[in-house]
Structures are given as structure tokens and as C-alpha cells.
């Protein structure tokens, strides 16, 4: 109960635009990626571990043997830049039965993405990258020259593409600016996304899903989108006609169909 209280107190965005994603949303995203025993999942800006624990919750349903439990305990990986959320994430995983959490206090953007090998890649990525932040040239230098965006969320999208296994899956929340930005850097990033990955679904998430934390200046009332990359053809759908919905109704999104 004390831990849950601390998390609720942290439900705000800081100077670099980090959000502590509502549990209903992390659980929804974990469900749609359909975790399997033996898979490895990563969150490169894991905050307090919401996506990681939601993944574990889904995977736990499939644990049948002692070997499955061992795979379960070794299935998650996280990195968090800020010390306090990092400590809370480690505590969170300990409370979920992970004795030696593979979570690190580090900055995911400070390694050259071209140096990642197959051993550095994951079956699944679940993330809500920080948005609204601006990265300096020393961070941007770790990315291909045509994708050196100053925007933090853009660089995390590039990182995900370089650390996702072939035939892997990813569900990622991004701001509208990623979808509609037309500068050369964003175009290069989206070109790689559509050329090298199969974009499965885009789901519009009204700002109310983050209520009451969307009134802060870094958000600006922008809507956000959920990306899921898998090896299926592109489809597009959204809850047409809905102005807003509560966090506990997020599961209904998967069953909604656009009006004619």
C-alpha cells in the first residue's frame, strides 16, 4: 500500500516529459503483444516498471512448470535514467517475485545504435518514451546522421528499431508530433519504420487517458498514439465519435469499430 501511494504521488510529468503510464494502459499493451514463455521483453525508459510488471502479469498466466518459472524470472530488462524511479522499479520487481531484476540506472541513448548485435536485441519492446525533451549533440551522435533528431521520443523510436529482433513485436506510445512531423529527420525515421517493419495498428488515445496529468505545459493537450509493430499488414483504426474515455475503459478500444 505504501508503494502504491508513492506511485500515485509521482503521477506527473517532469522537465523531460516523462509519464508514469496508467496501469490500465500498460496492461492493455501487454495483453496485445501476447507474451510467450522464453521471450525477452525490454523497456528502455522503464520508469517505475509499469510495463515490466504488466508483461509479467500476462506471462504468469502461461507458467506451467518450474522451467517456465525460471524463464519468467529472466524475461524482463529495463533501463531508467533517473535514480528515484529506478529504485522504485527495482522495488516493484522485488515485490513481484523477481529476485535479481535486470534493471539498470543508465541512459539508453548514449550508445551507438549501429554497434548493437543480435545478442542485444529483444523479442518484445513495451514503452512510453519520454517526450518533449531535447537531446544535445553528444547524444544525437550515437544515431545515424539522417535520424539525429533533437526530440527524445524520436530517438527512442530509432533505438527500438535497432534493438528489436527479427519477427519481434513492439507496442509504443508516441506523441502526435511523431506521426505528423514533416521535417527531414522525422521523415527518415518513419521511412525506416515503414520500410523495415510491418506497422500493424495505430490506436488513437485521447488525452483523457492520462487525466488529470495532461494539463501540464509539456503535454499541451496533444493526443497520443499507440504503435504496434509485428509481421502483419498495415491496418488503421480508432474509436471514432469518442471524445474521451476513462482509464478503466481502455480495454474496450480493442473491440470498437469505426462508424460507417
Where are these regions (language model features)?
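Long recognition/docking surfaces used for binding and targeting
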Residues: 1-10
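Short, flexible segments with low predicted structural confidence
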Residues: 1, 61, 164-165
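A conserved structural/catalytic subdomain of Rossmann-like adenosyl-cofactor enzymes
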Residues: 117-260
Amino acid at each position: 500500500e505504501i508503494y502504491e501511494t508513492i506511485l500515485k504521488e509521482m503521477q506527473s510529468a517532469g522537465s523531460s516529459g516523462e509519464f508514469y503510464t496508467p496501469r490500465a494502459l500498460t496492461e492493455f499493451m501487454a495483453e496485445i503483444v501476447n507474451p510467450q514463455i522464453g521471450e525477452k521483453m525490454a523497456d528502455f525508459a522503464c520508469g517505475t516498471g509499469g510495463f515490466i510488471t504488466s508483461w509479467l502479469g500476462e506471462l504468469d498466466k502461461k507458467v506451467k512448470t518450474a522451467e517456465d518459472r525460471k524463464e519468467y524470472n529472466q524475461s524482463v530488462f529495463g533501463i531508467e535514467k533517473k535514480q528515484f524511479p529506478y529504485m522504485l522499479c527495482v522495488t516493484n520487481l522485488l515485490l513481484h517475485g523477481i529476485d535479481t531484476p535486470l534493471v539498470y540506472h543508465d541512459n539508453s541513448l548514449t550508445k551507438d545504435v549501429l554497434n548493437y548485435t543480435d545478442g542485444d536485441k529483444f523479442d518484445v519492446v513495451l514503452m512510453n518514451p519520454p517526450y518533449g525533451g531535447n537531446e544535445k549533440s553528444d547524444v544525437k551522435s550515437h544515431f545515424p546522421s539522417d535520424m539525429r533528431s533533437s526530440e527524445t521520443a524520436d530517438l527512442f523510436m530509432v533505438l527500438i528499431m535497432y534493438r528489436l529482433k527479427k519477427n519481434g513485436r513492439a507496442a509504443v506510445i508516441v506523441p502526435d508530433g511523431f506521426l505528423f512531423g514533416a521535417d527531414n529527420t522525422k521523415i527518415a525515421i518513419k521511412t525506416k519504420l515503414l520500410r523495415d517493419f510491418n506497422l500493424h495498428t495505430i490506436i488513437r488515445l485521447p488525452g483523457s487517458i492520462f487525466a488529470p496529468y495532461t494539463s501540464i505545459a509539456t503535454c499541451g493537450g496533444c493526443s497520443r498514439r499507440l504503435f504496434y509493430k509485428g509481421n502483419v499488414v498495415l491496418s488503421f483504426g480508432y474509436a471514432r465519435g469518442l471524445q474521451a474515455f476513462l482509464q478503466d475503459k481502455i480495454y474496450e478500444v480493442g473491440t470498437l469499430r469505426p462508424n460507417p
